[in-house]
Amino acid sequence: MKRVQGFKGSRGQTPLFILIILIGILINLQNAESFNIPEKFEYELTWTGVKAGTATLEITRTGNDIKIFSTAQSANWVSVFYTVDDRVEAVLTKKSSLMFVGEPVNYRLRIREGRHRRDKEVIFNSGNKVTYIDHINNEKQNFDVPSLIFDPLSSFYYLRTLKLVVGEPVYITMFDSKKVWNVEVQVLRKEKVTLPTGTVDTILIKPLMKSEGIFYKKGDIYIWLTDDEKRIPVKLQTKVAIGSINALLVGGRY
């Protein structure tokens, strides 16, 4: 067997390639901790300018178990003619300090939006396989998937760790609706967004993917993230069956 000799720097100096590797590790560590855990966002939902409900997005950690929750509820006056009661949960496991958040373990989506009902679950198994369960229609199927794949909820947290440059799309592999998607996320431009706490610099993104939940989307989805290392989602806008829904960050802990 041929022995490969290592590179040696001058005495007392660190070889350049080692410095490059160390810098890369530090960058990865910074990205992995780019947002806080626990973290919770609270949103006010408006429909054509009128308050229509509330939504939350939360992530917690106990040991190596990571849990992400997303909820949306319609206001009382909206529920009279269109009830919204959505809850999405994702469970991940932390296996390496250099991982963005963790590897998906379980994903459960339960939504009620008017007459639209969904209760489905995805179990991420070993060996690059997932089990899809439709709890309403009593359906269960197994699928082969790539090794690095996310559910719709954990994919958003992965997105927040990526470098976002205007005009340069990023891609995320995701399992949803019994299919593997290579989702393109367009990075559109930088904008200022006014919140109850003041004006913040943001970067506007547009995922080219229509997932279920959060007022059953009918059109494009736009998300405004703070233009800093935390990438806090401060605003969301999407078309629905009638009109559009805006979600604006109004509280939480982050």
Regions found by a protein language model. Name each.
Residues 33-126, 161-254:
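Acidic, serine/threonine-rich low-complexity disordered tracts
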